[in-house]
């Protein structure tokens, strides 16, 4: 699983930068699909709710923009090294973004 943080800020990016970045993302996704390693992925809205014991929901979590999880991918990789190599092509690195790479435990 890839968790994406940071990257191009839509609040400050020009329309041209946004369009160019989206084309790079779509090209990357298309490449992963052609290789048969892309399973799923979505962008996430910047805010949500946190549910606590007793059914209490609070706004948040709140974090600095660079810490917000902006989206995720589920991919198929042989091992962590292969997953890191795949993540290395993420378009958001050009804008200071990061990719957290995690194994998913299958039950």
PLM regions with names:
Residues 1-107:
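Conserved, structured core segments of small domains
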């Amino acid at each position: 699983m890839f968790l994406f943080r940071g990257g191009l800020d839509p609040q400050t990016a020009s329309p041209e930068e946004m369009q160019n970045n989206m084309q790079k993302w779509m090209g990357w996704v298309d490449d992963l699909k052609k290789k048969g390693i892309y399973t799923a992925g979505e962008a996430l809205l910047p805010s949500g709710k946190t549910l606590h014991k007793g059914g209490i929901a609070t706004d948040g979590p709140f974090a600095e923009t660079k810490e917000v999880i902006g989206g995720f991918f589920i991919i198929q990789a042989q091992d962590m090294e292969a997953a890191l190599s795949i993540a290395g092509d993420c378009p958001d690195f050009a804008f200071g973004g990061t990719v957290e790479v995690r194994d998913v435990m299958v039950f």
